[in-house]
From Swiss-Prot:
The entry's keywords: Disulfide bond, Ion channel impairing toxin, Nematocyst, Neurotoxin, Secreted, Toxin, Voltage-gated sodium channel impairing toxin
One GO-annotated biological process of the protein: regulation of signal transduction
Full protein name: Delta-stichotoxin-Hmg4b
Family the entry assigns: Belongs to the sea anemone sodium channel inhibitory toxin family. Type II subfamily.
A single MF term (Gene Ontology): toxin activity
One GO CC term, this protein: extracellular region
Species of provenance: Heteractis magnifica
Family matches, as Gene3D superfamilies: Anthopleurin-A
Classification via InterPro entries: Anenome_toxin (IPR000693), Myo_ane_neurotoxin_sf (IPR023355)
Keyword Secreted in annotation: yes
C-alpha cells in the first residue's frame, strides 16, 4: 500500500516522502515506508 512520511513518524533518511510500505525492519508497531523516487529515501511510521 501507499504511505506518507511527512507527519506520521520519525524519518530514517529523507523526508518528506510518498512511497510504498516496504517489508524492511522498523520497531514493533511501526512500518517502513520507501520512496517511489529515491532508492535510499525511507522512514518508519506508526502502523495504522
Amino acid at each position: 500500500g501507499n504511505c506518507k512520511c511527512d507527519d506520521e513518524g520519525p524519518n530514517v533518511r529523507t523526508a518528506p516522502l510518498t512511497g510504498y510500505v516496504d517489508l524492511g525492519y522498523c520497531n514493533e508497531g511501526w512500518e517502513k515506508c520507501a520512496s517511489y523516487y529515491s532508492p535510499i529515501a525511507e522512514c518508519c511510521r506508526k502502523k495504522k
